[in-house]
Amino acid sequence: MSRSGAPIYEHEIQRIWAEQDFDSSGLKTVDGKKIEVFSPGWWNQGQGPDFETARLSIGDDFFYGSVEVHLQSSGWKAHGHNRNPAYDQVILHVVLYHQPRHGVFNTLENQIPELELAPHLKALKPQSQKQSKERLKRIEQLPGRCGVWIRENDP
């Protein structure tokens, strides 16, 4: 829920991630490693992680892979991603609110780095699930950031 008490939907957090609609200065994982986002990836409307082909650095390492988004840390396990190999390529778990007692691990028992967005948001204006989803679809159709070329040539 937002501070106003209005419900927040996962699609809204996905929209925020897709548009990078947050203060990206000083981004860090919940365990303190610096994050730099080069590309948030492409929104996946099918099975599997929420965003594919994301590019980012965590600490001194560069990553290319998937990003999964949830309202809270517990969403990872609640949705069964810890038991689904389709989520083994996730490089970052983005949540609105971090829950310290909910570790995020894939089927290979590797811990997935987590980013809590709440401290980086200026204001969270709740939108309906339908509004957020429609906006994500429009973002997906934009050719910005060399989108057309990347989509046609991305491995």
For the regions a language model picked out, list residue spans one by one.
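Short Lys/Arg-enriched alpha/beta "domain-start" segment
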Residues: 2-36
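Active-site beta-strand-loop-beta-strand hairpin of nuclease catalytic cores
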Residues: 55-66
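Short glycine-/polar-rich loops that comprise or flank the Walker A/P-loop
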Residues: 87-90, 110-112
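Internal, well-ordered alpha/beta segment that forms a basic, Gly-enriched binding/recognition surface
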Residues: 95-155
